[in-house]
């Protein structure tokens, strides 16, 4: 009898074909997010779960699913999943590194350009029927001759800097550990203090993971430092930013604009998270938002799902997964 795998969100048909010889599949091939109660009902006798960004696995969940052996996350950031609880229950927690790096960096730059050039308002103007031909309007901010500050210089921050070559911008960054001199010189990067980055950048791009140190790192105190009209772009994690502080900075005219692909309401592991995006923030004209599509490139999503599936297959075969967030004592290393 094949082990049971619960897949909580829609995946490509190719992934179902890959998994079918190894598992009894219980899928969700709709565009609806299953409730926690429904996922629990499906997982009570399951040996494996393929999880996605809206899902949350904690000690209570694992206790209700005693046969679970692996939670294979089709994502990179696993802050909604309790690593210690999985380890204590002997459940592998796996993730997919690296594949989200390039599309997230691309989207960040796209959001920066769109925000600076007022693409949201310009698009609405054309669609309204009011456009009758060229007029001197929608003057914005370009990347050429601008100072771009990147907060965080992990894989995504590096990918942002790499893709900003040739845009004519001056690049600076803040990271607890400085890059090596060769990398700084190759990318034209200058390390500055976090406060200086906020005070001297025309564009501020966030490239941080979410953890106890970074939650609400971008707060009222930091936003009070920005030069008037500066633009803030968040493609990383919603709760890195205090959205209430962002709204206040927008309303007083200090922050020139805010673009985001991620929102505080998505960070399920936070008991105090907002349950929705503030309507006043959504309505503010100097904002540009996308619905967490940083990895929404078909080829990328397919490969993310394939890697998540392969991690699950490895565990169900008695081997170590290729990319694990935790360490368990048993099982042989996987053959990559």
From Swiss-Prot:
Optimum temperature is 35 degrees Celsius. Optimum pH is 7.25-7.75. SUPFAM superfamilies: Formate/glycerate dehydrogenase catalytic domain-like, NAD(P)-binding Rossmann-fold domains. The keyword NAD applies. Inhibited by NaCl, NADH and sulfite. It holds the Pfam family 2-Hacid_dh_C. NAD(+) binds at residues 155-156, 175, 235-237, 261, 292-295. GO terms for cellular component: cytosol. The keyword Oxidoreductase applies. It catalyses: phosphonate + NAD(+) + H2O = phosphate + NADH + H(+). GO terms for molecular function: glyoxylate reductase (NADPH) activity; hydroxypyruvate reductase (NADH) activity; NAD binding; phosphonate dehydrogenase activity. Homodimer. Belongs to the D-isomer specific 2-hydroxyacid dehydrogenase family. This is Phosphonate dehydrogenase. It comes from Stutzerimonas stutzeri.
């Amino acid at each position: 009898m094949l082990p049971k795998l619960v897949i909580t969100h829609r995946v490509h048909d190719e992934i179902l074909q890959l998994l079918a010889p190894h598992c009894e599949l219980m899928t969700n091939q709709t565009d609806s997010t299953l409730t926690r109660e429904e996922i629990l009902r499906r997982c009570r006798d399951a040996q494996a779960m393929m999880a996605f960004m809206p899902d949350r696995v904690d000690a209570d969940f694992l206790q209700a699913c005693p046969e679970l052996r692996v939670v294979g996350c089709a994502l990179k950031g696993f802050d909604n999943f309790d690593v210690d609880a999985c380890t204590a229950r002997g459940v592998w927690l796996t993730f997919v590194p690296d594949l989200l790096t390039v599309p997230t960096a691309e989207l960040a730059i796209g959001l920066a350009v769109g925000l600076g050039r007022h693409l949201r308002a310009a698009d609405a103007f054309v669609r309204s029927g009011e456009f009758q031909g060229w007029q001197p309007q929608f003057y914005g901010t370009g990347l050429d001759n601008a100072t771009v500050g990147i907060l965080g210089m992990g894989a995504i921050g590096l990918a942002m800097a790499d893709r900003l070559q040739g845009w004519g911008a001056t690049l600076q960054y803040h990271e607890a550990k400085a890059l090596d001199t060769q990398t700084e010189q190759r990318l034209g990067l200058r390390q500055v203090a976090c406060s200086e980055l906020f005070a001297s950048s025309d564009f501020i791009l966030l490239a941080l993971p979410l953890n106890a140190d970074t939650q609400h790192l971008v707060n009222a105190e930091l936003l009070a430092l920005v030069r008037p009209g500066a633009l803030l772009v968040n493609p990383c994690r919603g709760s890195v930013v205090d959205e209430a502080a962002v709204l206040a900075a927008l309303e007083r005219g200090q922050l020139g604009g805010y673009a985001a692909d991620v929102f505080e309401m998505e960070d399920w592991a936070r008991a105090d998270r907002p349950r929705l995006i503030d309507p006043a923030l959504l309505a503010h004209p100097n904002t540009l938002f996308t619905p967490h599509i940083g990895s929404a490139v078909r080829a990328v999503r397919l490969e993310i799902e394939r890697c998540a599936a392969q991690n699950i297959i490895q565990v169900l075969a008695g081997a170590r997964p290729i990319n694990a967030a935790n360490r368990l004592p048993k099982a042989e290393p996987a053959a990559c």
